[in-house]
Amino acid sequence: MAIIYNPNKKIFTLHTAHTTYQMQVDPLGYLLHLYYGEKTNSSMDYVLTYADRGFSGNPYAAGMDRTYSLDALPQEYPSLGTGDYRNIALNIKNEKGVESADLLFKSYEIRNGKYRLQGLPAVWADEKEAQTLEIVLADENAQVEVHLLYGVLEENDVITRSVRIKNTGTGQITIEKAAAACLDFVQGEFDVLRFYGKHAMERNLERTPLGHGTIAFGSRRGTSSHQYNPAVILAEKGTTETAGSCYGMLFVYSGNFSCEAEKDQFNQTRLLLGLNEELFSYPLASGETFTVPEVILSYSAEGLSALSQQYHNCIRNHVCRSKYVHMQRPVLINSWEAAYFDFTGDTIVDLAKEAASLGIDMVVMDDGWFGKRNDDNSSLGDWQVNETKLGGSLAELITRVHEQGMKFGIWIEPEMINEDSDLYRAHPDWAIRIQGKKPVRSRNQLLLDFSRKEVRDCVFDQICVVLDQGKIDYVKWDMNRSMADVYAGNLSYDYVLGVYDFMERLCSRYPDLLLEGCSGGGGRFDAGMLYYSPQIWCSDNTDAINRTRIQYGTSFFYPVSAMGAHVSAVPNHQTGRVTSFHTRGVTAMAGTFGYELNPALLSDEEKQQIREQIKTYKKYETLINEGTYWRLSDPFTDEIAAWMSVSEEQDHALVSVVRLMAEANQATVYVRLRGLKPDAVYLEEQSGRQYSGAALMHAGIPLPPFTEEYEAYQFAFTELKEAGRLYEKVQKWCDGNAENRVVISIYGGSGSGKTTLATALQQYFLNDGTECYLLSGDDYPHRIPKRNDEERMRVYKEAGEDGLRGYLGTKKEIDFDRINEVLAAFHEGKDSITLRHMGREDGEISLEETDFSGISVLLLEWTHGGSDDLHGVDLPVFLESSPGETRERRIRRNRDENAASPFICRVVELEQEKLEVQRKNAGLIVGKDGSVYEQ
């Protein structure tokens, strides 16, 4: 079971796959925190120590025991007024203005499944995936109950926490502060990792040692904000991407928040995350309950990357609810940077037509389609289609776009209102303002009071009229200002719940709608939004170089599948920087991928690059969005930005690298990969080179010399599974073979993959410490390939197909005597053997004395490795293939002239006939499906 209660010691233990969380009700009734970290089956109450601490008070119930003080003990949910002078999780004020809550244990319940939060986003799971622990603390004097909720997702290595606060008295109480979670550590030297920023430069990583005192950050802007993300990591000193202990907290909330990390007088650490107490004062009438939004906790003993991966899996599988979260999503083009406000219906159709020719799937009509909206001064709140501007109805425009084979999306900003709007003129009181005071403007707009149901209903009805006009596939929900004019202490919280209510209704009414969140880019990039929208526009900054840093910081908690990322025009509209089309594409592929430009202004070469980029992205989309994500560099300090995605089976990987700094006579840059199988052999698809997983992870790959500023590379790796399976069979055969030296032939049709398989098999032998030599039989025809092709044609012309059949692969074509001599010399144990090397042109034939001392395996890679004329092969291995497959591979290989000619095709067919006859000689067969079986 994930949750265990020990009634003798009153200890609650929460287990995940690799972690343990433990707390205890002490003899006085206080709930003390014992432990959170690597999995253990021990009772951790021994960590509690007691001493007489000067100026640290003692609860009255402790009697004369001066060693008991809540000011020095680790607590699960500390409150104000108990003699604990550190930062507290809860502050309750009664009608008389007294701020105190002395919370003691009352009861608990363990149940299957994950608790739910009314009106709030939260991690979801079925009954088999999670368990819930609910602990009730109470203060009868303050007349308040605090329900601590714990959700344990065992296999995901996450624990969620939330709090319900109930007024059990007859009078009103006021919540002045409420954290969702507190973590107390009795020891440890920690760094605090937080993610700061600004509009168009969000989520920059800052790592700060936690000294004595408090590091605090948060938002009081009404949103989670561009300035600080509602997430924090507490890492032990020296923790890296791949080693060390670290703890994460992620707030599932989109409004004001506060995070406090404190090191106290006794070198203990407290970490708090929850609602921001500034501008917050929430009244609770008798019997009412208040819910604090959820925090997701996770711990890693294997560094920051593992911690990030745990959050990525949790968000993809247990936060995002959209049907699109695990689906391939459309590659879109957005009209904003293509046209801004200056567009018509014809403009959108032309954009769709051009985009369709490039392989783009969807066009999105951004701001400017409603009311009198030709700039940012008017019409927010008036969600009626401007048919004059569009040259017809929205339904007609949608049809015209769909006729181009394109999906259609639209932009909305439901929370906003302009003073120059019909809605404002009808309901000026619906805009948030302080009575008797002029409101604060931002971007020439005001904020609608979404805490009021009638306001939400009015806007929702307008939006539904728009969405019901045709098949709208996608909506981008924007929010382009911060909240000011907070007229009441409950406003900011109730406002966010109003936004969630609106989004819930929207998602329920339009379940097939792909919703993308946005707030001036990444101003509301949080887990709360991802509950409703599977992706969020990562930043209004589309500069490829800045984006490497923005997406790097975002990746510490949020998966690639959540990051809206597009290729934009150059010079970049935000920075003026010029980067290559390829570099912009590589960076945008670390996200949902799309375009933010006018394709009509592109060159033919750039348009072709778009086609190639989309082809590449769709090939690797599942790997990018569902794979295990690894950060390979720090773009704030390193000369490159590098990252990779690895498939769950570790058989595919995509590595991306962007050069950030240029210098003359630059040293070679090596990139070490992560997350691969050490003993597996991987093929790099572009170069055809093979590497062991261990080599890629420990030595890395050298990057080609950089030839231009901000150059980018992508490397795709595929595990050669057939080689691994074959090696297992070959190894068993070798173990049962008494010979000191063995010869293994890999044979099959031309272009069937013999070289790739043989090279990988050689790598497996070398990995295990077995010296192995790879010999190519292509060095042993009587004539160089060019002359041999001529001879084949001569034979065919003189003797027809029967004559050609009697020539191919026989002693007439192949110097079997010479290669048989090589195999015999190897079996005889000779340390030096003369080998022949043959090129493809006249004069490219040479003899070379080769050292075979210490070599115990000779791999012969050759079409004719199963011939009856070949002697000395101990284990022939046959590769299945058809003539059609062989022909296609030869064409792709592009080594032979006229590979697709009728004559060559017939040669391949005759070759295949002979191979089917020679198949009987094989000891092992590699099937077309990659299986390996005995003859």
Curated annotation (Swiss-Prot):
Residues the record lists as binding Mg(2+): E176, E277, F280
EC number: 3.2.1.22, 2.7.-.-
Region (Sucrose kinase): 721-935
pH sensitivity of activity: Optimum pH is 6.0. Active between pH 4.0-6.5.
Region (Alpha-galactosidase): 1-720
Keywords: ATP-binding, Glycosidase, Hydrolase, Kinase, Magnesium, Metal-binding, Multifunctional enzyme, Nucleotide-binding, Nucleotidyltransferase, Transferase
Residues annotated to bind ATP: G748, G749, S750, G751, S752, A824
Signal peptide, first to last residue: none
Record-linked InterPro entries: Aldolase_TIM (IPR013785), Alpga-gal_N_sf (IPR038417), Alpha-glycosidase_related (IPR050985), Glyco_hydro_27/36_CS (IPR000111), Glyco_hydro_36 (IPR002252), Glyco_hydro_36_C (IPR031705), Glyco_hydro_36_N (IPR031704), Glyco_hydro_b (IPR013780)
Pfam families: Glyco_hydro_36C, Glyco_hydro_36N, Melibiase, PRK
Active site per UniProt: D526 (nucleophile), E606 (proton donor/acceptor)
Reactions performed catalytically: Hydrolysis of terminal, non-reducing alpha-D-galactose residues in alpha-D-galactosides, including galactose oligosaccharides, galactomannans and galactolipids
Binding site for substrate: D366, D367, R443, K476, W477, D478, M479, N480, C518, S519, G520, G521, D540
Cofactor: Mg(2+)
Activity relative to temperature: Optimum temperature is 50 degrees Celsius.
One biological process term in Gene Ontology: stachyose metabolic process
PROSITE patterns linked: ALPHA_GALACTOSIDASE
GO MF annotation list: alpha-galactosidase activity; ATP binding; carbohydrate kinase activity; magnesium ion binding; nucleotidyltransferase activity; raffinose alpha-galactosidase activity
Self-association and partners: Homotetramer.
Family that this chain belongs to: In the N-terminal section; belongs to the glycosyl hydrolase 36 family. In the C-terminal section; belongs to the uridine kinase family.
Function (record text): Bifunctional enzyme with alpha-galactosidase and sucrose kinase activities. Produces sucrose-6-phosphate directly from raffinose. Binds ATP. Phosphorylates sucrose specifically on the C6 position of glucose in the presence of ATP. Hydrolyzes melibiose, raffinose, stachyose and synthetic substrate p-nitrophenyl-alpha-D-galactopyranoside with high activity. Low activity against locust bean gum, guar gum and synthetic substrates xylose alpha-D-4-nitrophenol, glucose alpha-D-4-nitrophenol and o-nitrophenyl-alpha-D-galactopyranoside.
Name of the protein this chain belongs to: Bifunctional alpha-galactosidase/sucrose kinase AgaSK
